[in-house]
Amino acid sequence: MGNLFTKSTYEWIKQVDTSKADLFKQAEESMMKLQDQKTKEDFVQEQVKINETYSTLEHFVEEHRKELATLSPQHEQDVDILLQSLKLRKETLMRYELPNWNVAHNVPIYDVEQHPMVLRDRMMAENLEYLAEEMYPTEKMIVWGHNYHVRKNNSKVKYADYGQNFLNNMGDYLPDSFKKQTYTVGIYAYSGASLDSSDNKTVTPVNKEKDPTSLESLLKYANHSSLFVDLVHTPYNKRTSWIYTPRIALYWGFLKEEMILKEQYDGIIWIERITPAKII
């Protein structure tokens, strides 16, 4: 049954109301199957049904807040997280899923802001702001995400082979006042392989062909198995000019990107050889 969130939430709600737990399970399963709809009319009809179900679940959680809180380690805070998660399910359903379906069915998208990849990152930025300002306003946070999502100005990064700029990402949509409070780290590898997140099965090797002035190649010269490079406190000079000038780096170890590292990251973690993750 779905992922860890789905399983744990189902068991949590089940302790209060079995029928609502089953309703939650049904909504999650329907959400996963939504992209299988053959026509837009069928899609929208199913979309409305799922949205109504999540609204019913939101109302249930609000009504049974105290009961649910007593059954959870962090009590009230866990209920707040659950409500935010249900809200995000609805927003994903109503803002992201149809554009994603359109792309899968070759329906043209004329407004780049309505592209599912852009919508996804805008929603990520909105959620991060909520977590930082509303849920954990006095605490430090660690946000783990792919380089593509966390770097600060993704729209300035280019596909090196085509000269075309990337789409806006989460970092682009975060306000400057927010970004000034963050320390953003990019992670890159020289060799090895990683697990493809699209199926958690395919092993994708790191491209062996390297530009001699690329990020990966330059840090290889240090002759260490791993490195951390701070970019914030590194002044410009002849030896550090590579941080301030356009540089090739590999997206997921295989796609050439061109960027000015200083515009994107506050630090870099470089690993000489990576190995694929093992799914537990």
Where are these regions (language model features)?
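Structured catalytic-domain cores with a bias toward divalent-metal coordination
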Residues: 1-280
